[in-house]
Amino acid sequence: MRMINLRPDKFHIQDDNKNLYEVFNHNTTIDWKNAKILDFGCNIGNFLISAQDYIKLENYTGIDLNLNSIKMAKKKFPEANFIFYDKWHISYNPPGTKDLKASDILEEKYDVILAYSVFTHCTVSETQDILNDLLGLLNPNGQILFTVLSDKEFHGFYNWICTHNKQYNVPKLNVDDIEYENVVYWIDYDNIIIDKDDVDMNECSGFCVFYKLQNFNKVIPNAKFLGVPPKDYGSSFQTLYCLK
């Protein structure tokens, strides 16, 4: 396994120009203006940068397990609702509470639940558990919109990593060494792990997960593929799914 010395905490708080409103509006018909929205893994409220003119801020709730992200979000968008989700995560909130569900801290129901690049950093079982929990927070006819990384984009992500070699001392990876017959790919910041759902993630400092499009429904059988949002929305490497 090749060593990749990245600091995962450096990658979480992001204030970027992604048009997340258009990402989640891709191939959907949502009454955004009247929708009650939960942004699961909201970071610093990045969805609102492009969406604030299309939604009512008082109908928006963002939760994140990074306390600093929540503090920044509250300053940026004081009219919206932000809640610190004190759940354990090996990279982003090691002191947090294990097995803390979103439904444990939220009492309301929502028309739309968003999760941008959340499951990029979750094991398969975590993804399944989280989505099952979030389904219980939906109003009738509500839906969850979420993105995952596609294995088809791995080469692009690999190139992105290599462009950061100088800054982060990342050794060049040999993509050809990775076999593509498996459902899931683990890209760990310390090691490369291929299709190892039984790996003790407590030993990993951080990771990314890539899914094969044709096999993702083995993981989430009822998820509907909504396509790949245009890259000019700033959503490189992401594919969009809907779950009701």
What is the role of each PLM region?
Residues 1-34, 44-57, 63-104, 145-244:
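Class I (Rossmann-like) S-adenosyl-L-methionine-dependent methyltransferase catalytic domain
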Residues 40:
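Conserved beta-strand/loop positions that form the S-adenosyl-L-methionine
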Residues 106-109:
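A glycine-rich helix->loop->beta "capping" turn
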Residues 114:
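A conserved beta-strand element that flanks and buttresses the S-adenosyl-L-methionine
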Residues 117-118:
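Short catalytic micro-motifs in class I SAM-dependent methyltransferases
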Residues 123-124:
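Helix-capping/helix-break motifs at membrane-protein junctions
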Residues 128-140:
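A short glycine-rich, Lys/Arg-flanked "PGG" loop and its adjoining helix->strand segment in the class I
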